[in-house]
UniProtKB/Swiss-Prot annotation:
Belongs to the DTD family. One of its GO terms (molecular function) is D-tyrosyl-tRNA(Tyr) deacylase activity. A non-functional D-aminoacyl-tRNA deacylase. InterPro entries: Daa-tRNA_deacyls_DTD, DTD-like_sf. Pfam families: Tyr_Deacylase. It comes from Bacillus subtilis (strain 168). This is Inactive D-aminoacyl-tRNA deacylase. GO terms for biological process: D-amino acid catabolic process; tRNA metabolic process. The dtd gene from B.amyloliquefaciens strain A50 confers the ability to grow in the presence of 20 mg/ml D-Tyr and 500 mg/ml D-Asp to B.subtilis, showing it can be used as a selective marker in bacteria that do not have a functional copy of this gene. Spontaneous resistance to D-Tyr is very rare, on the order of 10(-9). GO terms for cellular component: cytoplasm. Culture in the presence of D-Leu, D-Met, D-Trp or D-Tyr leads to growth inhibition due to their incorporation into protein, as well as inhibition of biofilm formation. Partially contradictory results are seen in another study where growth occurs in the presence of 20 and 500 mg/ml D-Trp but not in 500 mg/ml D-Asp or D-Ser; whether these are the exact same strains is unknown. The gene is dtd.
Amino acid sequence: MDEEVVGQIGQGLMVLVGITHDDTEDDAAYLADKVVNLRIFDDSEGKMNLSLVDIGGEILSVSQFTLYGDTKKGRRPNYMNAAKPDKALGLYEKWNDLLREKGIKVETGTFGAMMDVQLTNSGPVTLIMDSK
């Protein structure tokens, strides 16, 4: 992105969002609710017991079609399982809107652009979530 910062957050989550052909707004709603309420932040005793809502956290939402890369055959990933850009963009925007409706500050990258994304991963804690 030409060294321009287009999305940045403080404490919270970076969510890499992959969208496939049969994903729906119901899937986006389910995952938005799950992400903001999942108790994965430490409480005063160091136990994972607080949600993004509890800590007043933010989300950096990054569209990532490569999550649906299939590497079973050959030496180059096949991205046929990723939704086409027009569908993916609409559902990605809906996902971000649903998070904002829940009172979460959401920053995004630029959809479809090549970006350098930086992450400080405490723990590290990395989770894979799916609605199906």
